[in-house]
Curated annotation (Swiss-Prot):
Its job: Catalyzes the PLP-dependent transamination of 2-deoxy-scyllo-inosose (2-DOI) to form 2-deoxy-scyllo-inosamine (2-DOIA) using L-glutamine as the amino donor. Also catalyzes the transamination of 3-amino-2,3-dideoxy-scyllo-inosose (keto-2-DOIA) into 2-deoxystreptamine (2-DOS).
Lineage: Bacteria, Bacillati, Actinomycetota, Actinomycetes, Kitasatosporales
Protein known as: L-glutamine:2-deoxy-scyllo-inosose aminotransferase
Gene: livS
Alphabetic keyword roster: Aminotransferase, Antibiotic biosynthesis, Pyridoxal phosphate, Transferase
In-chain residues carrying the UniProt-annotated modification N6-(pyridoxal phosphate)lysine: K202
Originating species: Streptomyces lividus
Catalytic activity: 2-deoxy-L-scyllo-inosose + L-glutamine = 2-deoxy-scyllo-inosamine + 2-oxoglutaramate; 3-amino-2,3-dideoxy-scyllo-inosose + L-glutamine = 2-deoxystreptamine + 2-oxoglutaramate
Length: 424
């Protein structure tokens, strides 16, 4: 029984616990406690004579990314919607997005009454394929959103050139790529704007949260209006007890603000980010080599990537192996061997059960709009292949030791050797 699969009652490769995520920074508890007693828990709270935690984080994150402006927001989804609206995207416009991503890549476009146009991805990087984007541009296209997926950075040379050629804004969705860089420039700073998620699983997290970064002051001002009910931060210090937010009447918005608790936590977590990246990067490189020995194919990143980060470790099954059972069965077997979750890649958004515009009355904007937003009209063969063959592992596992990587490789090797025993 020692060599039989754990999912079938055999001994698991590993029974020791894995690193826990999130991992609070040294100053996190004190920072949150200071907010508790500060008398100001949100950006709309009364000014108390010192910069808000929201402003402190905004400055720190802008500096980290090498840009002039950062507008924190309530979530990654909110950040994407803010960026889209700040680009002028609205009713009936088309926005090109990758077909392989989290559902927010499509739902945020729907949320601004626009039409998501799903494009296929590069088979090596699993990021937006520039050739597919070129073929999808029409006179109705108003923006392109590129997602730096899993552990890869997209081909930004090709995508920025394409966007410039068609005079289209390019938004970088960096929810899975905090700190990555392309030709020496941080992701998010390469295009019109960059958006980030600070949700629980992310490499920089406050449980929930987000941010929009940009080099453009006018763009940042539009985002500020959109995320704070049409208000922006005052240009001068307010009096005690007054709000820092002022009403301008320039642009209507909604409340998508980050709380002071989240901002304080993010400022502290940011201090640990690069050190954690270094650990993940070293372990991912080791794991790449170990898994290649068994025929697995790790996800690649684009040639221009100068700093790689690893949100999700993604690896493709060896060619022609384990094809007799679904990927979910393989993932369950690996999870049983390791005592942590190994998951199949995202399904293409076009057939993700969580993405169903027809289930929401707010998107019933006429026969033509409903036809255009029907996800079944798109064919995404590369994304479909990834959903059949790519396995993923959360970055927390990469914060372990070298022996942990060897355990992962041993589990992948064991499941491959005993794959014939698996049944769907």
């Amino acid at each position: 029984m020692a060599q039989s699969l754990a999912v079938q009652g055999g001994s698991a490769v590993r029974t020791r616990p894995w690193p826990v995520w999130p991992r609070p920074a040294a100053g996190a508890a004190e920072a949150v406690q200071q907010v508790l007693s500060s008398g100001r828990w949100s950006i709309s709270g009364p000014y108390r004579g010192a910069a808000s935690q929201e402003r402190r984080f905004a400055r720190a994150f802008a500096e980290y990314n090498g840009v002039a402006h950062c507008v924190p927001a309530a979530s990654g989804t909110a950040s994407l919607m803010l960026a889209l609206e700040a680009c002028g995207v609205g009713a009936g416009d088309e926005v090109i997005v990758p077909g392989l991503s989290w559902v927010a890549s499509g739902s945020t476009v729907l949320g601004v009454n626009a039409v998501p146009v799903f494009c296929d991805v590069d088979p090596r990087t699993l990021c937006l394929d520039p050739e597919a984007v070129e073929a999808a541009v029409t006179e109705r296209t108003k923006a392109i959103v590129v997602v730096h997926l899993y552990s890869a950075v997209a081909d930004m040379d090709a995508l920025t050139a394409l966007a410039e050629r068609h005079s289209l804004p390019l938004i970088e969705d960096c929810a899975q790529a905090h700190g990555a860089a392309y030709r020496g420039v941080k992701v998010g700073a390469l295009a019109t704007a960059g958006t980030f998620s600070m949700q629980h699983s992310k490499m920089l997290t406050s449980g929930e949260g987000g941010a929009v970064i940009t080099r453009d002051a006018d763009f940042a001002r539009r985002v500020e209006h959109l995320r704070a009910d049409g208000r922006v931060l005052a240009g001068q210090r307010p009096g005690p007890g007054e709000m820092e937010l002022v009403e301008t009447g320039e642009l209507m918005g909604n409340n998508r603000c980050l709380s002071e608790f989240q901002a304080a936590l993010l400022t502290e977590q940011l201090k640990d980010l690069d050190a954690q990246h270094a650990i993940r990067r070293r372990n991912a490189a080791l794991l790449d080599g170990l898994l290649r020995e068994s025929g697995y194919v790790p996800q690649e990143t684009s040639e221009g990537t100068s700093t790689r980060t690893h949100y999700t470790y993604a690896v493709r099954l060896p060619e022609g192996r384990l094809t007799h059972v679904g990927l979910a069965t393989v993932a369950r077997a690996l999870s049983a061997e390791l005592g942590c979750t190994v998951a199949p890649s995202y399904a293409p958004i076009t057939r993700n059960r969580l993405y169903d515009p027809a289930s929401r009355r707010r998107f019933a904007l006429g026969v033509e709009h409903q036809a255009l937003t029907d996800p079944k009209r798109f064919e995404l063969p590369v994304a479909e292949d990834a959903a059949r063959r790519v396995l993923t592992l959360h970055h927390a596992a990469l914060l372990g030791a070298e022996d942990d990587m060897r355990d992962i490789a041993a589990a992948f090797g064991k499941v491959l050797r005993h794959g014939a025993d698996l049944t769907a």
